[in-house]
Swiss-Prot record:
Protein name: UPF0457 protein SH0868
Sequence similarity: Belongs to the UPF0457 family.
Record lineage: Bacteria, Bacillati, Bacillota, Bacilli, Bacillales
InterPro entries, alphabetized: PH_SunI-like (IPR055365)
Top-level division of the source organism's lineage: Bacteria
Length: 86
């Protein structure tokens, strides 16, 4: 199943396999792209959700909220980033 990432005025919705993740846009503090092969999130400060298959991919889009970090693994990182920052 392909991943779907959509944004409207109220929320970001990420659907992948059986997951249906909804993030209120009011909680999003930052959206960034990351292509560092050894990128390591700060494990002490937040809960982390990794979404997508990590096999053979270093392209990520990261959504930061106050208490959570969502890491989206995708080959379409620019498309996902553009959708989230529109």
């Amino acid at each position: 199943m392909a991943m779907t990432v959509k944004k409207d005025n109220n929320e970001v919705r990420i659907q992948w396999r059986v997951a249906d993740i909804k993030i209120p846009t009011s909680e999003i503090k930052n959206i960034s792209q990351d292509q560092e092969i050894h990128a390591v999130p700060d494990l002490d400060s937040k809960n982390i959700s990794r979404i997508g298959s990590t096999f053979g991919k270093t392209n990520r889009v990261i959504i930061d909220t106050d208490d959570h970090e969502y890491i989206i693994y995708t080959h379409n990182d620019q498309k996902v980033y553009n959708e989230l920052t529109k």
